[in-house]
Amino acid sequence: MKKTLMASAVGAVIAFGTHGAMAAAPADWSSVAATDVTLFYPGVSPVEWITKGTEHGGARALKKGETCAGCHSEEASDMGEKMASGKKLEPSPIAGKAPFINAKVQAANDGENLYLRFTWKQPAASGAAPMDADNPVKIAYMLEGGSKVELAEAGGCWGSCHGDARTMPGAADTKTKYVKDGSLANGVYYDLNQWRSGENKAFDGYVATERVMEGGQALVDAQGKLDGDTWTVVFTRKFAGGEGDVTLAPGNLYNFGFAIHDDSATGRYHHVSLGYSLGIDAQGDITAAKQ
């Protein structure tokens, strides 16, 4: 993937956030390398569709150890166009829905905390009725250690996307995201952090047998702002936490993916990244070097 340097954001017009007292993100993000990531509208493309192989030819490549990003990173925007328009894998297209979002991701650490900074331009609103009127924007990322979750290494957070989860066609509204054979005790889970714009709140949870949006102890801080048409959200997360928190350590790589719920979206109507590796003082697709 292409990497660039990102100028630091200035002049917040709208600011939201929760504020941690101990950790401090880099004062000058312009010195931290940024990774360009295209998030795309995924339509109805659950893990079952990806791995079955009858409609998705990439299932064979996955069995050989290839990653989703290895095949699709350069065509993510095209995939989003096809699905947002209803040409493929979307039985109920939303007129005006943005097909993709280009984001930049920066990462750093101070030996005790991980800092993740996401920036992207606000797409034009679709004009559709809001699904979550209280939160125009939400952003979440997932971490996984050990590649115990199905598809975590190859597809990032796609291992939590199932065809019977809520907002999928015909699914019950009570069924949340989950992972196959999910178990905190056995390390089969995603660590989940989310920030919501309208509520001015951050959530620290996990996805195992179900999605739980509380109970984590690693998330210290999440701050977001809208400067003109550009969003900036910074997460501060301790290396170690508690149950449901992936423990981070220098020299290691972790499976990583993130999603943006734009335009007051909920459930599957988000924009998602493919799967990437996050390195803590180790070379990954995204590298969090000590500052």
Curated annotation (Swiss-Prot):
GO cellular component terms, A-Z: periplasmic space
Gene3D superfamilies from the UniProt entry: 2.60.40.1190
Binding site for heme c 2: C157, C161, H162
Post-translational modifications: Binds 2 heme c groups per subunit.
A GO MF label: metal ion binding
Pfam families named among the record's database cross-references: EB_dh
Cleavable signal peptide: 1-23
Location of the protein in the cell: Periplasm
SMART domains per UniProt: EB_dh
Keyword Metal-binding: yes
Keywords from the UniProt entry: Electron transport, Heme, Iron, Metal-binding, Periplasm, Repeat, Signal, Transport
Upregulating conditions: By anaerobic conditions.
InterPro entries: Cyt-c552/DMSO_Rdtase_haem-bd (IPR019020), Cyt_c-like_dom (IPR009056)
Primary subcellular site in the record, as a coarse category: periplasm
Binding-site residues for heme c 1, renumbered to this chain: C68, C71, H72
Function: May play a role in nitrite reduction. Shows peroxidase activity on proteolytic modification.
Additional notes on this entry: The second heme binding site has an unusual CXXXCH motif.
Protein name in UniProt: Cytochrome c-552
Taxonomic source organism: Stutzerimonas stutzeri (Pseudomonas stutzeri)
Organism phylogeny: Bacteria, Pseudomonadati, Pseudomonadota, Gammaproteobacteria, Pseudomonadales
